[in-house]
């Protein structure tokens, strides 16, 4: 390692530590500062456990949907030509551009009490799923799309000329190349989902044991001046998110190896 590269690494690590590692460590320390009994009683509290369960399982479900639909949308954008393609390219990024509270208002206007399409899911669990789905849609699409654009289609054509079916070509050639991008998009989708708050405020109603998610539960603890409880819930989410990311990486490596 040269002196200049060592300096760059040092600056990068200091910056990363200041922005990410130290704040995360502070949250964990705050969570266990009151003792393990307090930590355990907080995260196993009925209302808190229900919020964690709803958040994690909804985020997992949304991630699965995004993996399939996001990859499909990316495929259509790259491989197909159709009228309105440029408009779709722009609209995919709308969830990125909209403030989450505005996203909540958009969804409430369409799926609330006065729904113009006759679908009212406000203050129900499907509202949580829909809100998560809306704000996480672009992640897999935007991770997979550039990889698809760079794939050598001659290899796919060669496989087809040798008698490989479209499914076999996709499974053995395309999917292993897309696996890292799909994994990254899935990880971002899950992380974005478990942290969502703004779009849920108007749409889900934040009803305990029904539609309350962990971000709302954390905010409630802070408003009640119970920072250790908020930190405890945040720590549980952190551990779960890290576990999911590790699992996704394992799956990605196995898919790539089989390809």
Go through each PLM region and give its residues.
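Transmembrane-helix boundary motif in ABC transporter permease subunits
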Residues: 1-2, 37-39, 61-92, 105-112, ...
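Periplasmic/extracellular loop-to-transmembrane helix junction in inner-membrane transport proteins
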Residues: 2, 6, 27-64, 76-80, ...
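C-terminal transmembrane helix and the adjacent membrane-cytosol boundary/short C-terminal tail
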Residues: 3, 7-11, 22, 145-160, ...
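Transmembrane alpha-helices
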Residues: 10-15, 64, 94, 98, ...
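Hydrophobic alpha-helical transmembrane segments of multipass integral membrane proteins
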Residues: 18, 53, 57-69, 73, ...
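Membrane-interfacial helix termini and adjacent extracytoplasmic/periplasmic loops
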Residues: 36-44, 49, 84, 103-134, ...
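Interhelical loop and adjacent transmembrane-helix boundary motif
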Residues: 46, 201-246
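Amphipathic cytosolic juxtamembrane alpha-helices at the membrane-cytosol interface
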Residues: 57, 83-89, 125-127, 151-184
């Amino acid at each position: 390692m040269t002196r200049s590269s060592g300096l760059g690494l040092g600056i990068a690590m200091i910056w990363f530590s200041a922005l990410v590692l130290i704040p995360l460590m502070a949250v964990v320390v705050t969570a266990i500062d009151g003792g393990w009994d307090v930590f355990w009683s907080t995260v196993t509290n009925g209302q808190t456990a229900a919020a964690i369960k709803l958040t994690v399982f909804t985020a997992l479900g949304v991630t699965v949907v995004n993996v399939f639909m996001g990859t499909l949308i990316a495929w259509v954008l790259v491989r197909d030509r159709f009228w309105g393609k440029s408009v779709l390219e722009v609209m995919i990024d709308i969830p990125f551009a909209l403030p989450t509270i505005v996203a909540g208002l958009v969804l409430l206007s369409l799926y609330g009490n006065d729904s113009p399409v006759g679908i009212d899911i406000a203050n129900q669990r499907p509202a949580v799923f829909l809100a998560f789905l809306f704000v996480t849609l672009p992640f897999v699409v935007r991770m997979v799309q550039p990889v698809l654009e760079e794939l050598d289609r001659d290899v796919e054509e060669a496989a087809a000329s040798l008698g490989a079916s479209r499914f076999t070509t996709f499974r053995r050639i395309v999917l292993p190349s897309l696996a890292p991008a799909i994994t990254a998009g899935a990880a971002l989708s899950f992380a974005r989902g478990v942290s969502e708050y703004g779009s849920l405020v108007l749409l889900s109603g934040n009803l305990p044991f029904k539609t309350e998610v962990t971000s709302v539960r954390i905010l409630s603890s802070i408003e009640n001046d119970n920072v250790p409880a908020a930190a405890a819930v945040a720590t549980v989410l952190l551990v779960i998110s890290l576990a999911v990311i590790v699992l996704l990486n394992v799956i990605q490596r196995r898919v790539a190896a089989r390809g």
